[in-house]
Amino acid sequence: MRVLGIETSCDETGIAVYDDKAGLLANQLYSQVKLHADYGGVVPELASRDHVRKTVPLIQAALKEANLSAKDIDAVAYTAGPGLVGALLVGATIGRALAFAWGVPAVPVHHMEGHLLAPMLEENAPEFPFVALLVSGGHTQLISVTGIGEYLLLGESVDDAAGEAFDKTAKLLGLDYPGGPMLSRMAQQGTVGRFTFPRPMTDRPGLDFSFSGLKTFAANTIRANGDDDQTRADIARAFEDAVVDTLAIKSKRALDQTGFKRLVIAGGVSANQTLRLKLADMMQKRGGEVFYARPEFCTDNGAMIAYAGMVRLRSNLNSELSVSVRPRWPLSELPKV
């Protein structure tokens, strides 16, 4: 079975072809970072228009990369939510139209389920059950996963997501959009311990997160200490350490609560090397394992959508002919497989 995956939920156009026997056959990605950089964030209308321009050419490029034609595709999977409604509609409309024209099923995919299943693309794929830490620009969640579609939300951010806090703090430090990865690189030059940031909501029971206060703490620290290069690097280091420690503390609690031995980290922030090393060390001490996708599959991409679509299609969970998207869509509402 060969599935074409289409990802257009935000500011990346991702197209991929996944074969259930041969694995990933093609992966094409176009990032709109330069388009939105001057605005300091994603402009929804510009994102939608750029997806209109790029999606079909990338589909053609993916088919060429895989040395396939339309007749070789058995299904089309597309991101149906959550995300920006205009951007989602571009991918959904094109995906649905191609499926109709080619006479194959169309499968709407939950964007965060795509992220959650992305580590399954690796050779060392996790087995169920596991705790999933989903960390991106729009979501920070801890989820108990006992099977496909068997998702129990354990905790989530009550305000800013971790990735959003990274980007906002990076902007305070004078870094360009998207600043999260730049902040992490700056943090590598920082002095450990010069500044100490709080670990929000770790002094009380529960698995929810809060990161908006760290941004305010960073702003106050910058004002009080100046913004020379070394001070900025030291602040970046303190901020990143605070976020990583908070994620690790909450993940440990989730593992204790569930009794699971496996931890999956997914989403754009899961590419952060400091976070990976921290969680790997934690899981080694616990006698467990941590799983994550390669960096190119941590950020938005078509490969995770193609794979998730294939999993859903195996259970005949394709949808009707109408085009519909869900900008807000809880993972808990997905059907079990």
From Swiss-Prot:
The residues listed in the UniProt record as binding Fe cation, with positions renumbered to this chain, are 111, 115, 300
Q: What cofactor does this one take?
A: Fe(2+)
- In which compartments does the protein localize? Cytoplasm
Please name one Pfam family that this protein belongs to.
TsaD
CDD domains named among the record's database cross-references = ASKHA_NBD_TsaD_bac (cd24133)
The membrane spanning regions, by residue number, are none
One GO BP: tRNA threonylcarbamoyladenosine modification
Q: What is its main location?
A: cytoplasm
- Asked whether the UniProt record includes tRNA processing among its keywords, one would answer yes
Please give the family membership noted in the entry.
Answer: Belongs to the KAE1 / TsaD family.
Known function: Required for the formation of a threonylcarbamoyl group on adenosine at position 37 (t(6)A37) in tRNAs that read codons beginning with adenine. Is involved in the transfer of the threonylcarbamoyl moiety of threonylcarbamoyl-AMP (TC-AMP) to the N6 group of A37, together with TsaE and TsaB. TsaD likely plays a direct catalytic role in this reaction.
HAMAP family tied to this protein: TsaD
UniProt name for this protein: tRNA N6-adenosine threonylcarbamoyltransferase
Organism of origin is Yersinia pestis
